[in-house]
Amino acid sequence: EAVPAFLARLERTAADRYRLWAEAVPEHAEGLLRCAAREDDIADRAEQIYPATAPEQVAAMEAAIGPAKDTYYEVFSTLTPIEQMAVQAKAERQGAAAWRAMIETESDPAIQSALEEMATIEEASADYLDALLPGLG
């Protein structure tokens, strides 16, 4: 449960990044803010399915999220917003694959369905970025 809950925290980091891009590229703010909302939605769903609220789980996630965020922002710091969004589109597809990989480990059809929905939501943001980027470059 801790890994999906940790992924939920990373989704929130991505949501924050989308909000920054909305400020940087205001003519596309509406679509980018929809992507941010999708990231928050995925995080909410993951936290509902995999709450990971045990103190040791929370402590481990708190210890790991800082370095993970630092790495995420460090990778992006040398890239233009357009390059960052191209990387993010790929990350969204990797996220979709991660949620789908968890389906095999679940026996509850409701959780399997929720994970598939989360993957589809990830792909919606990737599709948005893939459509947006050619017009920005």
Regions found by a protein language model. Give the residues of each.
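Non-heme di-metal
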Residues: 1-137
